[in-house]
C-alpha cells in the first residue's frame, strides 16, 4: 500500500501498544527518505479505558501524534514538517507531492486557502466582517477588489467555494451577494479528491453540523445523501449534536476533526476512509475568508493606497496652484519693470542735456619737421 494509505491506517486510537507497533512496521516499508528518522521512534500515550494514542517520540523528547503527522504531511505544511522532521531537505519534502497525487489527497488545497485567508484577516482587518455594513466598508477601502467583484457580478457566473456553497450573483446588490455566500458556508464536509487531488467533490454532512446559519438555504448547498462512516439512522449519528454548546465548544461541528483531542466531541476516527477522502469542519466564513478562498488577495491594499496617495496629491496640487500662479505673475511684472528702467537710464528717452552726449575723442597729430633742405 502507499505511504498516505498506511499513514491513514495509524490515524486512530489503539487498544494496546503492540497493535500500533505492527501497523507502524508496515508504514515504514512505504515511508520516503527523510521521514524514517521520526517514524522509527513509535510511542503511545495512555488515555485510559484501554485507549492508546499512537505517535512518535522526537529527539527533544516531544511527543507528536500520528494525527498530527497526517495533518502536516497531507496539508503540505512545510514549516511544521521542518519542525518535526529535523534536517529534512527540500527535495525530500517535495517528494510528498507525487505521493499525494497518487492517492488524490485533497487536503493541501484547503490548507493553502486557509493560510491565505489568515493572511488577509491579519493584514487587512477591515475584511474580517460578516455584516452588510462591514462588507461595504471593506469594498470602499479596497477599490481594485470592488471593481473586480463588480465585473464578476456583471458576468453573472457562479463560483464554487472551497468552504462549501457558492458565490452566486443573483441579489440586487453585490454586497448582498457576498453576504448570501458567507451565510452558505460553515459545517462538516465530506471531501473526496479527484484528478490527482487537483479537484475535489464535497458535500455537507448535516447531522455532524451542529450549528447552521439561520439564513442558510439548503438548496444552495450540496447535501450528502449518506454519511461516509455511520448509517444514517445510527443513534451515534442522529444524537451527535445532542447537548451541543457553541459558546463552550467554539466550533459548529462535532465528529469532524481527526486531529482534535480524542476526548473531545469534535474528534472522529477516519482510519477506514481511503487516503483520497476526508471529513473536515469548515467554520463559517467572514469576508476575509471569502477573499482568500477566491484567491483575490492580490487585489487588496495596494491600489487603495495608490488611490489615496493620488487623491492626496491632487488635493495638494489644487491648493498650491493658485499660489504658484500668483508668484509667477509677480515675477513677470518685475521683469517688465526692470527692462523699462534699463531703457530709461540708457538714454532711450530722446533729446536732453549734455549728460546724455557722448564724450569727444581727441586725436593728437605730430608737428611738421623744421629742418631746411640741404643745398
From Swiss-Prot:
Please give the InterPro entries that the UniProt record associates with this protein. Answer: Baculo_ODV-E56 (IPR006733)
Q: Where in the cell is it found?
A: Virion membrane
Coiled coil ranges (UniProt) are: none
What Pfam families is this protein classified in? Baculo_E56
What topology does it adopt in the membrane?
Answer: Multi-pass membrane protein
Q: Which GO terms describe its cellular component?
A: membrane; viral envelope; virion membrane
Q: Which residues are glycosylated?
A: 183
Highest taxon above the source species: Viruses
Query: Would the keyword GTP-binding be found if you checked this record's keyword annotation?
Result: no
Q: Which segments cross the bilayer?
A: 154-174, 320-340
Q: What else is known?
A: Expressed late in infection.
The UniProt similarity line reads: Belongs to the baculoviridae E56 family.
What is the protein's given name?
Answer: Occlusion-derived virus envelope protein E56
Which species?
Bombyx mori nuclear polyhedrosis virus (BmNPV)
Q: What is the lineage of its organism?
A: Viruses, Viruses incertae sedis, Naldaviricetes, Lefavirales, Baculoviridae
Amino acid at each position: 500500500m502507499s505511504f498516505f494509505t498506511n499513514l491513514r491506517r495509524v490515524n486512530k486510537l489503539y487498544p494496546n501498544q503492540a497493535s500500533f507497533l505492527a501497523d507502524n512496521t508496515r508504514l515504514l516499508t512505504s515511508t520516503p527518505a527523510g521521514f524514517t528518522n521520526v517514524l522509527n521512534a513509535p510511542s503511545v500515550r495512555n488515555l485510559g479505558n484501554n485507549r492508546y494514542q499512537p505517535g512518535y517520540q522526537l529527539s527533544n523528547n516531544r511527543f507528536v501524534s500520528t494525527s498530527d503527522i497526517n495533518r502536516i504531511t497531507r496539508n503540505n505544511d512545510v514549516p511544521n514538517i521542518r519542525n518535526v522532521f529535523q534536517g529534512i531537505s527540500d527535495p525530500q519534502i517535495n517528494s510528498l507531492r507525487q505521493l499525494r497525487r497518487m492517492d488524490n489527497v485533497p487536503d493541501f488545497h484547503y490548507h493553502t486557502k486557509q493560510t491565505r485567508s489568515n493572511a488577509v484577516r491579519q493584514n487587512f482587518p477591515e475584511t474580517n466582517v460578516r455584516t452588510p455594513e462591514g462588507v461595504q466598508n471593506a469594498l470602499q477601502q479596497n477599490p481594485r477588489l470592488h471593481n473586480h467583484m463588480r465585473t464578476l457580478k456583471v458576468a453573472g457566473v457562479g463560483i464554487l467555494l472551497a468552504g462549501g456553497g457558492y458565490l452566486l450573483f443573483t441579489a440586487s446588490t453585490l454586497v448582498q451577494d457576498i453576504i448570501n455566500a458567507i451565510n452558505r458556508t460553515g459545517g462538516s464536509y465530506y471531501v473526496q479528491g479527484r484528478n490527482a487531488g487537483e479537484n475535489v467533490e464535497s458535500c455537507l454532512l448535516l447531522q455532524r453540523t451542529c450549528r447552521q446559519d439561520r439564513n442558510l438555504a439548503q438548496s444552495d448547498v450540496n447535501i450528502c445523501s449518506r454519511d461516509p462512516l455511520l448509517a444514517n439512522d445510527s443513534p451515534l449519528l442522529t444524537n451527535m449534536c445532542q447537548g451541543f454548546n457553541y459558546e463552550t465548544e467554539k466550533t459548529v461541528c462535532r465528529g469532524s476533526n481527526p486531529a482534535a483531542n480524542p476526548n473531545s466531541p469534535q474528534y472522529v476516527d477516519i482510519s477506514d476512509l481511503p487516503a483520497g477522502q476526508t471529513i473536515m469542519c469548515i467554520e463559517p466564513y467572514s469576508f476575509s475568508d471569502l477573499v482568500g478562498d477566491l484567491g483575490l488577495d492580490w487585489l487588496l491594499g495596494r491600489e487603495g493606497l495608490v488611490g489615496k496617495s493620488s487623491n492626496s496629491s491632487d488635493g495638494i496640487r489644487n491648493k498650491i496652484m493658485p499660489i504658484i500662479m500668483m508668484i509667477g505673475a509677480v515675477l513677470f511684472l518685475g521683469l517688465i519693470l526692470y527692462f523699462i528702467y534699463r531703457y530709461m537710464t540708457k538714454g532711450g528717452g530722446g533729446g536732453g542735456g549734455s549728460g546724455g552726449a557722448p564724450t569727444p575723442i581727441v586725436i593728437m597729430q605730430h608737428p611738421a619737421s623744421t629742418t631746411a633742405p640741404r643745398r
